[in-house]
Amino acid sequence: MRTSRSSGAVPPRDAQSKNLKRISTMAGAYGLRNYTVRDIRELKGKRTLVETLAFTPEEAAAAEAAGIDTLKVRFDPKSPELAAEIRQAAPHTFMSFSLPLIAVTSPQEALRLAFSAMEIGGDAIMCQWSPRFIQALAEAGVPAQGHVGLVPRKSTWTGGLRAVGKTSDEAIELYRQIKALEAAGAWAVEIEVIPQQILQELSRRTSLITSSIGAGSGGDIQFLFGEDILGDGPGPFPRHSKQYRNLYALRQQMQAERVAGFREYIADVQSGAFPGPEHVINVDKAIVDEFLEQLDKEPR
C-alpha cells in the first residue's frame, strides 16, 4: 500500500515477469530488485549466487548488465556520494553496503551509520563489527552480514595476512564466531581465505548465507572483487582470484597514447604545423586593412 512517506512511482505490477521484485527501501523509496533477503535465504543449499564488489558506477552497471546476482559496495560516511552513484548505476541488483570498521565506537553509532547507508538504497549491510554491534542492527530490522576468517583489518589476531582455519582449533573458532553472529541476528557472513573443506562443513551447519571469498566452493555465494576479476590493477593479484580481463594493460596503453598525443601536439606547435589552414578563421585583406586603419586612430 502506498503511503505519504514513500517516494517515487509505484513499481509496475509486471515486474515479476521480468524476474524483479517490487520493493520499498528503508527510506521509503520504491524500486525493483532481482532478489530480496528472503529470496536469497530460500536459495541456501540450492544454487550458488555470484557476487562482486564494484568500485565505480561503470563497474556496477557492467555487473548488472552481465547478470551478477549481488553486489557489495564500500560506503564512505565522509563522502557517500560515490556509493549513491553506484546504487543508481545498478538499480535492480541486490546491494550490500560495506561499512568501515573504525567509523563507529558503539552499537548506537553503528546503527546510525547503517541507517545512513540504507537511506541511499542499500538492501543490506556488510561489516566487520562484533556481534554486539550487529545485534543493534538486527533489532532495528537492518539486514547485517558479518565477516570471519581472514579479516584483513583484524589480521594481527590471526598472525597476519594468511589463511585461517588450517588447524582444528582455528576451524572450531570459526564455527563459534559464526554461531555468535547467528545469535546476534545476522543474516549472512562473509568467509574469507579458509580451507574449502572447512567452508563446506561450516555452511552446512549454519542458517546464515555464506559468502565465500578465497574459501573455495561450498558457500551460498561466490565472491570476488571487481578489480580482480577485470585485472584492473598492477598486481600482484590475490592467489584466490582469477583475472578474466586485463583492464590495467588497457589503461596503461591509454596513458601511453595520451603522452604520445601531447608530445605530437607540442612538436606540431613548435614546428609551425599546428594550427594549419583547416584550423583557423580568415577574413579578406580589406577587412584587415580597415581594422589596422581604425587601430591607428586608437589611443596608445
Residue ranges and their predicted role:
Residues R2-R300:
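Alpha/beta enzyme core
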